[in-house]
Amino acid sequence: SLKKFSFTKNEKFIQEVLWRVYWKGWLELRPTVWKDYLFDLEKIRKDYINNQNYKNAINGSTNLKCFDEWVKELKENNYLHNHARMWFASVWIFTLKLPWQLGAEFFLQHLFDGDAASNTLGWRWVAGVQTKGKNYIAKEWNIKLFSDNRFQNIKLNEDAQTIFDSRTYSIETKNFENIQDIENKNLIIFDNNLSFETSDFKDNKFNKIFLVLNKNENRKIKLNQKNIEFKENLFEDQKKRLLEKSIDCKIIDINDLETMKENLLCLYPSVGENLDFINSKKLKNISFLYRKIDQYSWKYCNKGFF
């Protein structure tokens, strides 16, 4: 990108990429945060299954026009601008008074760019449990200003206290070093690394590349159909590009990994549903390969975001 455009034009894009790297690194060093989130979510789902306020929120029928429009946009486009995501989360938590865990799930179900780390930790930050005692409060004037006065009479809770969570998380010691002998082995790739030809390992020779699709049957958070189809199309596109380069590849279901007994290499999927599957099935024949940017950056992700 820097070869085509000036740093000034690239700066915001680079910042957003590095924010994702930071969030992923922070969660890698504290993976129990993700585990606790899924545990809490399972209980909260049961508690709110018949909650009308929750149903109104996910159906975009809260009578808070800006929020209802964001729900519609999210469902139709599977995307929200970063600023709108912050407003959405703040309204969900502090005005609608719904658990942040359900909101984070709603985002992951619909966002094409949904990511376990940036999504979970972003919602935690808005709630005030990521940086203890500091929450993000959406303000009426701010929404009006940056939506070109599209919305009026926005009644928000602008004096909300942070959500309290007494749990703390210590940094875990992790090894992100790559093994030396990676030639002439089979490689598996998940949906977070579907650009093999631009990866750090594009020049290595692999026997075969398996593109691993994780469908809803193995997910704790079920993706909506548009999101599933989006991922399937990404896999098909990556397969097409690999075949054009005469690289032997195949799309497989994540369950097929259990029947593959040979030693496998894997572009590291990061903390989330794909890694959860590998760990839950105790697939010891898989060795991870880490990106250089992650190897360099994650060791510095030891502080919170203020």
Where do the model's predicted regions map?
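Structured secondary-structure scaffolds
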Residues: S1-A116, W125-T131, Y136-A138, N142-L194, ...
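Trp/Phe/Arg-rich N-terminal binding region typifying the photolyase-homology
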Residues: S1-Q15, W19, G25, L29-E42, ...
